[in-house]
Amino acid sequence: YCNEIRRLDYYVGEVVRELESQNALSNTVIIFLADNGRPFPRAKTRLIDDGMKTPLLMCGPGIEPKTSTKSLVSSIDIAPTILELAGLDKPKSFQGKSFAPILSNPNAKIRECAFSEHNWHDYQAYGRSVRKGEYLYIINKFPDKAWIGPEDSVSSPSHQQLRKAMLSGKELTPVQSDIFLCPRPGEELYDTSKADKLQIKNLANDPHYADVLNEMRKILKDWIDSTLDSVPENPTKDSFDHETGKRILEKNQFSDDYAGKKRRAEYLICPQ
């Protein structure tokens, strides 16, 4: 990862120098973003911050250098932002919101909530989440399975060493043991502030957070309904072993059922 950062810095510098040579730098917005694909335990495919919170760096005209923001944005907001910066209107079919106001005012807010989802990725899965302020709410429709991550995480030395330690009776930290938790809760609620930055303390059953839980439930349900989402009734089976990460080969392993198929979500042009 350190080498990737060094390479990024070098090649972005090359692009900047080329833009300068063409006298185009002052009229160019540079955007760097990354996916959530690091294959580490409790990262890739997880709907907590370590799985969903990704880098987003921008520079260009109207963007104050060396500033940062805590405002909530989603990846679907990038396209509307580019269009606004280019002076173009956003098509009605776009779900995202332009975060151009944040570029000139880091304290500006463009959205109250951001949503995430996890579907089949080497293993059966259906997870949905909503982030509002400091609260994160997650539902899991396959709680009988450990949320271990994809095959490249399960087969990694870090995951296998943790499994070896667990099986030998060594005490793991709550963060380490979480990847082996089975069954898992069907609902999770976290306060992502300094009190629980790693999302370890599930507040879903805490009566003090009942109002927050009900609010987050409704927000997520409304989003699921608006996007015509649904849980697959005949999901594709696991393609890899949960413990070893080795390939499983079976007949009729893959299903044509998927999230949203029951409600024909693929025909939805613009969620309301």
Residue ranges and their predicted role:
Residues 1-2:
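Short glycine/proline- and acidic residue-enriched helix-loop micro-motifs
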Residues 6-13, 73-80, 94-98, 184-187, ...:
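A structural signal for well-ordered alpha-helical segments within the folded catalytic domains
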Residues 13-21, 43-93, 97-112, 201:
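Substrate-binding rim/cap in mid-to-C-terminal beta-strand-loop elements of soluble/periplasmic
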Residues 36-48, 59, 195-198, 206-207:
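Active-site His/acidic residue clusters
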Residues 53, 170-187, 194-272:
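Long, internal low-complexity/basic segments
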Residues 86-188, 211, 263:
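C-terminal cap/loop subdomain of S1 sulfatases and analogous C-terminal strand-loop tails that border
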